[in-house]
Regions:
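N-terminal and secondary-structure boundary signal
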Residues: 1-318, 322, 328-333, 337-343, ...
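Extended, alpha-helix-rich binding/interface surfaces that flank or overlap catalytic cores
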Residues: 352-353
Length: 383
């Protein structure tokens, strides 16, 4: 792309269908409109955030009306719309139904594409991985439109456009990738490689009703009133992260992207259209309890023990836990042991702080709890 990468910010206060459609058109206008990306006959894949089957008011999934508006714009430009993902929990059809998206699929005649077939895909030169097994179905289209939801994330601080593409990893392989990648910095490297491999042509962020606190599955809905759009998932994340009060160096995905020198990772490479960053910024946005600004750039034999003490770990609340066993099943290191009467124990000596358990818990019974050193640092205001 020649010149700065556009990121469009538009106010959208609710999910009134006509209002969402108009706001989306305004967001796409600085990008040349949907017609600049789509020619008649193009097959277009929508990749929303379909983490779990929760109703729209819970702000867990991309809202049905954002999917409707994007679909109508694509159809008006002559494209055929498909919708696909590999949910973290439950079947795609179940999540579409419980999230209210199935109604839009039926109304507009969208074609549903479950991500079922893992295939090795080469990562572009400059990645950490040579190839990654991703859903083969995601590579059968002329254009991918990434439709993330604005949410917090216990491991990655925020889940926006780049993180949403982790949904192209098929089902049960997700925990194994968490194990392979490990901490948030290495997970960020994996996410960047997936982003560069999948290469969505358009990214539209649903930030009308976002999620703050202990996201991405059990945080609190927060009215943000924002739609954002960009051809670059990375540039979109850079701008929106700043709006939420998270400096790029404190966001693992953005920090690693700057170190790699990826396009869209630096403010001077980006031009914001629509709302000014000052007008779009969100006051007092609540970040995950696991969030910390502590830098452990020390030798491993020193930083390891410090990092464990200054990290957060999952806590299973026995008053909420139903002992369904989902957390045990998704933990990549088998660190969780459930109690018969509710709740459970996490073996901190092997826990890798991926928070897959918290992400997948259908009851919201798991939350991050700070280690002893982190509690002190937070009390002192330095973490």
């Amino acid at each position: 792309m020649i010149g700065p990468i556009p990121v469009s910010l538009v106010r959208c206060l609710n999910y009134d269908p006509d209002g969402v459609r108009q706001s989306l058109r305004e967001a796409l206008d600085p990008l040349g409109g949907m017609g600049a990306l789509i020619s008649p006959g193009h097959k277009v894949l929508l990749k929303p955030n379909l983490l779990q089957g929760k109703p729209p008011e819970k702000a867990v999934t991309t809202h049905p009306e954002v999917i409707r508006a994007a679909s109508l714009e694509i159809m008006e430009a002559g494209g055929t719309v498909f919708i696909g993902d590999s949910p973290g929990s439950g079947s795609l059809s179940s999540v579409l139904s419980k999230s209210g998206i199935a109604g839009v699929v039926e109304d507009l005649g969208l074609k549903v594409v479950p991500f079922r077939t893992p295939v090795p895909v080469s990562v572009p030169v400059g990645g950490v991985y040579h190839s990654i097994e991703l859903a083969g179905e995601a590579f059968e289209f002329d254009l991918i439109v990434n439709l993330p939801k604005l949410k917090t994330h216990a491991q990655m601080v925020l889940t926006l456009a780049v993180k949403n593409l982790f949904g192209t990893v098929v089902g049960a392989a997700k925990p194994s990738w968490h194990l392979k990648a490990g901490d948030s910095d290495h997970m960020a490297e994996l996410l960047l490689d997936i982003y560069r491999t999948v290469a969505p042509g358009l990214n539209i962020l649903d930030g009308v009703l976002g999620m703050e606190g202990n996201g991405p599955g059990s945080g609190a809905p927060r009215e943000v009133g924002l739609l954002a759009a960009s051809p670059s998932a990375l540039a979109l994340d850079l701008v929106v992260s700043s709006l939420l009060g998270v400096d790029a160096k404190e966001n693992p995905v953005l920090r690693r992207s700057m170190e790699r020198g990826l396009p869209g990772s630096m403010p001077e490479q980006v031009k914001v259209f629509g709302l000014s960053p000052e007008d779009a910024s969100v006051d007092d946005f609540i970040l995950p309890a696991s969030y910390t600004r502590v830098d452990f750039s020390l030798p491993d034999f020193i930083s390891g023990p410090l990092k464990r003490s200054a990290s957060s770990y999952p806590f299973l609340d026995p008053s909420i836990c139903t002992t369904c066993g989902i957390c045990e099943g998704v933990c990549p290191v088998s660190a969780i042991s459930l109690f018969d009467d509710g709740g459970g124990d996490v073996d901190k000596s092997i826990c890798i702080n991926c928070f897959c358990c918290q992400e997948m818990c259908p009851e919201g019974a798991i939350r991050p709890v700070a280690g002893s050193l982190l509690k002190i640092l937070k009390r002192l205001g330095v973490a």
